[in-house]
């Protein structure tokens, strides 16, 4: 994709990361590492492509109300309560909120943004709370 964007004069790439690309949670180490790799890939690509007119950013969602979240992390009332405890906005994110962020980053309105990992997590990373080890 990047090669074609360079040939045509520019574009925008938006990678999907996660707040777990920044956190270290021993029970999901491989997921943490893979999302952390996406963050670094985003930054390296942004530096390598900036002068060619290609912007590269990533979106790092927190817990979003999806079927996957329902099956993987929202498995009980207790699990939901733990998620809310570490989310200052006290609600799950909606898929449309992630889509809107991606659309913004891909748009001309974000033409001076590259190399950023945009966290959309209801304030979780600001709280700086992770799960007990």
What are these regions (language model features)?
Residues 3, 47-51, 111:
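Alpha-helical segment proximal to the catalytic Tyr-Lys
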Residues 14, 56-59, 69, 115, ...:
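Hydrophobic structural elements of the Rossmann-like NAD(P)H-binding subdomain
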Residues 18:
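Residue(s) in the substrate-gating loop at a strand-loop-helix junction
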Residues 23, 103, 114-133:
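Short C-terminal tail/terminal secondary-structure segment
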Residues 23-29, 51-52, 90, 95, ...:
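Active-site loop immediately N-terminal to the catalytic Tyr-X3-Lys motif
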Residues 34, 42:
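Active-site helix of classical SDR
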Residues 51, 63-86, 127-133:
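A glycine/serine/threonine-rich, flexible loop-to-helix segment
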Residues 58, 78-109, 113, 120-122:
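C-terminal helical subdomain
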